[in-house]
Amino acid sequence: MSTALFDLTGRRALITGSSQGIGFALAKGLSAAGATIVLNARSADKLATAADQMRSIGASVDVLAFDVTDHNQVRVSVDAFEASHGPIDILINNAGMQQRGPLEDFPADAFERLLQTNVASVFHVGQACARHMIKRGMGKIVNIASVQSALARPGIAPYTATKGAVTNLTKGMATDWARYGLNCNALAPGYFDTPLNAALVADPDFSTWLAKRTPAGRWGNVEELVGACVFLSSDAASFVNGHTLYVDGGITASL
């Protein structure tokens, strides 16, 4: 089989929340596959630093600063970028946040922030990009879900709810938009060593538990998400729609 199926040359990929962590790793991976990258975050300073790092390895990079939870700001930003730079062919909805705490005491305003950042953002940015993709009759949307889309642990019930919503919103996107030539899927990481998981990575008891609970016996490295993301962003996934691909070291396969 030719590797041309996975070639992203000539395509432009917007990755939300891509100044660090998983988003930045995916940006580097899609660039290595040939894509032009559009980095996104709220902080212009963080974006500039990330863009400089990308360019130092030869990547073609643009930056687009907007708040993924602000519907109007998202739409205006995406429309203006498409008009000035050209089509966004691939969208990676990666922006997200975590907040832990006992469910019985979890603050309502914190729950709302999780919903806005983890779920509403997928709707806002997905809709803004899909309107252009539909006109062109093609596009790839990859929503970053989580192992918590399928499994729960104490102390993260609100986060678990948001990631379950992402997988179902992905199915809805596929159901509505596949007829227009869009492929909408989700990528669900297991436990990866990222800034979002810094507190867990620093906890030796949790790492010991994770090594026993995960068949692969370890934390994931963010680079190990790249292959799955390139696949879902490429022609190789032309008949894949509404699917959630777990990259989790086997944790969802094992009791």
How should these model regions be labeled?
Residues 126, 162, 170:
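Active-site helix of classical SDR
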Residues 102-103, 110-115, 141, 206, ...:
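Substrate-binding pocket helix/loop in short-chain dehydrogenase/reductase
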Residues 12, 19-21:
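Conserved glycine-rich cofactor-binding loop
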Residues 131, 175-179, 238:
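Alpha-helical segment proximal to the catalytic Tyr-Lys
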Residues 2-4, 151, 230, 241-255:
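Short C-terminal tail/terminal secondary-structure segment
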Residues 44-45, 65-77, 108, 223-224:
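The beta1-alpha1 cofactor-binding region of Rossmann-like NAD(H)/NADP(H)-dependent oxidoreductases
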